[in-house]
Amino acid sequence: MAHPHLLAERISRLSSSLEKGLYERSHAIRLCLLAALSGESVFLLGPPGIAKSLIARRLKFAFQNARAFEYLMTRFSTPEEVFGPLSIQALKDEGRYERLTSGYLPEAEIVFLDEIWKAGPAILNTLLTAINERQFRNGAHVEKIPMRLLVAASNELPEADSSLEALYDRMLIRLWLDKVQDKANFRSMLTSQQDENDNPVPDALQVTDEEYERWQKEIGEITLPDHVFELIFMLRQQLDKLPDAPYVSDRRWKKAIRLLQASAFFSGRSAVAPVDLILLKDCLWYDAQSLNLIQQQIDVLMTGHAWQQQGMLTRLGAIVQRHLQLQQQQSDKTALTVIRLGGIFSRRQQYQLPVNVTASTLTLLLQKPLKLHDMEVVHISFERSALEQWLSKGGEIRGKLNGIGFAQKLNLEVDSAQHLVVRDVSLQGSTLALPGSSAEGLPGEIKQQLEELESDWRKQHALFSEQQKCLFIPGDWLGRIEASLQDVGAQIRQAQQC
């Protein structure tokens, strides 16, 4: 076997050659190439005139000396037009019912069938055997067929509960194509003088028969790690719970796994990675509704679970909660304690500030943030004279929230431990403390847990960075995963700064 990274580079260059002159079809070309390299079938859905047939023709050039067959189905198409005419000579001389297959589907490596759903039962039945078993019954003989890629196309989906569903289920990759959208690409397409039938692939990049056969065995040796299987099973269970989810047969799941193995193999890896699971978005949908649903579920899987994003956030939440508990346990020791004055028999208890509190403006920290006057508040600034008067005589007390703006009216009280407590509208309280009176920095227990969590985050991010070099995965998906990991990292760093 060639060095894995050299193989990945070669396949990338091969795909780039196949994509030349085709605008906004890179993803379709890459998945069709992956299907061809792993012996799978593709269904292209889209309106006429959007290069569906050209995609199939291009794939012929991926292989040395590959033969191609393409046919436009109609309601009147006959098996002879697809599988070859009967041999009159064999029937006349020997009474054998045998087809002349040269130039037809049974002898082609690349097959393109347009308007596939218009095929009649006789064609469909033979086609199913060809896809499933790579065999063709020609008279009394069963012949192996060399088909590496079947591309079927239509501008519509098969009717539900029709005889076409069996064939549709064999189309592992399903791609929904549209017209060229980008203005610059549209202009380039209109003015391009490239002959679409020219071979754009250098001979050195084309796949030989020996390489193709060897790769089929090596694809099967790619491992499926336990954590990747758990992600697949999680997706399957989630789909089973949704009432509108499409039915996905066990056969389709099994074929999809081989596609994931091929993606890993041609990306230079020895095992399927979570990033390969994004390919399932093009394998599991049935119609427009299920296409959106499948993409949503895989997006949740990729941005929430594939690199332990949700698990790390859950751990972070537990660490933050523990930090709050420790802060609350320390509140009695760190809180500002006022001095109770005499006057037991007076109507209102009087207090005064400690003698060491002498600043004209006092900034008091909330042991836990509160939402006051529609603002998340972490500290309050008081005029010392106003606070002294309130402690002595009661009445209204005002302070600047987070030290800014006008002084706002506050619900402030002295608790039984002689601590100042501010309350929000729901009467949730937070003890006030002088700056520097609270514990310095994070507790050792919390600091260690956050460092371990950050280390795990770095490992997951490094894994993703290594795995994202995958030709067959669109860049926008990789961008969303990167953003989800960066969000987790930012929350961890924020917690470390508290």
Curated annotation (Swiss-Prot):
ADP binds at residues 23, 49-54, 196. Residues 331-437 are annotated as: LARA. Optimum pH is 7.5 for ATPase activity. Induction: Part of the ravA-viaA operon, which is under the direct control of sigma S in aerobically grown cells. In cells grown under oxygen-limiting conditions, expression is largely dependent on the anaerobic transcriptional regulator Fnr. The operon is coexpressed with multiple anaerobic respiratory genes, many of which are regulated by Fnr. Levels increase toward late log/early stationary phase. SMART domains: AAA. InterPro entries: AAA+_ATPase (IPR003593), ATPase_RavA (IPR023671), ATPase_RavA_C (IPR022547), MoxR (IPR045427), P-loop_NTPase (IPR027417), RavA-like_AAA_lid (IPR041538), RavA_ATPases (IPR050513), RavA_LARA_dom (IPR046898). GO terms for molecular function: ATP binding; ATP hydrolysis activity; identical protein binding. Disruption phenotype: The double ravA-viaA deletion mutant shows increased persistence when grown in the presence of fumarate and kanamycin. It catalyses: ATP + H2O = ADP + phosphate + H(+). It holds the Pfam family bpMoxR. It is a peripheral membrane protein. Its EC number is 3.6.1.-. Residues 1-306 are annotated as: AAA+ module. It is found in: Cytoplasm; Cell inner membrane. Its main location: cytoplasm. One of its GO terms (cellular component) is cytoplasm. The keyword Hydrolase applies. CDD domains: AAA (cd00009). ATPase activity is stimulated by ViaA. ATPase activity is also stimulated by interaction with the inducible lysine decarboxylase CadA/LdcI at low pH. The complex formed with CadA/LdcI represents a possible means of regulating RavA activity in response to acid stress conditions. CadA/LdcI may stabilize RavA oligomers under acid stress conditions. PANTHER family: ATPASE RAVA. Homohexamer. Interacts with ViaA. Interacts with specific subunits of the NADH-quinone oxidoreductase complex (NDH-1 or Nuo complex), particularly with NuoA and NuoF under aerobic conditions, and with the fused NuoCD under anaerobic conditions. Interacts strongly with the inducible lysine decarboxylase CadA/LdcI, forming a large cage-like structure composed of two CadA/LdcI decamers and five RavA hexamers. Does not interact with the constitutive lysine decarboxylase LdcC. Interactions with ViaA or CadA/LdcI and phosphatidylglycerol are mutually exclusive. Belongs to the RavA family. NCBIfam families: PRK13531.1. Component of the RavA-ViaA chaperone complex, which may act on the membrane to optimize the function of some of the respiratory chains. RavA functions as an ATPase. This is Regulatory ATPase RavA. It comes from Escherichia coli (strain K12). The lineage of its organism: Bacteria, Pseudomonadati, Pseudomonadota, Gammaproteobacteria, Enterobacterales.
